[in-house]
Amino acid sequence: MIEHIDEVDGYSFLNECYRILKPGGVMRISCPSIDGAMDVYHNWDNVSDEWKQESGLVTKARFINHFIYYETAGYQGKKFEADGSIKMVNNPNYWHKYMYDREDFDYKLKYIGFSDVNFVNKHESQYSELKGLERRFGGKFKLWPIESDITLETKK
């Protein structure tokens, strides 16, 4: 959920995580990556027509503007019906306020003092307690036409 708070608050959150973790403690983060949106944009011809029609994002310009404006800045009032029963209402508390990539996380976490920043596959971990924790929206409509998450583990 770190993508739902702005960059300054996200940095404060990471600092607080570092402060309260015991030495050797592990933090795991999983969130969408801005690289995913860029991949969709640059590989638009590979996105299925079905996904484009269901999402209403039928051109790559419309897709990237939706991503930048609605998801990053927040948009009041638009309702997005995902599968006929679940609706996400855009409001300033829902949409993405800051999107990360691996380089950004790596820099910030190491600057704060974390060590061993490891980018891992979703649902996988060297720690049995951290395996399979990620949960994403389900349903017949897939929100992203590609896999685009960042999952990382880092130690204090």
Annotated model-derived regions:
Residues 3-5:
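A short His-aromatic
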Residues 7-22, 26-153:
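S-adenosyl-L-methionine-dependent methyltransferase catalytic module, highlighting the catalytic core
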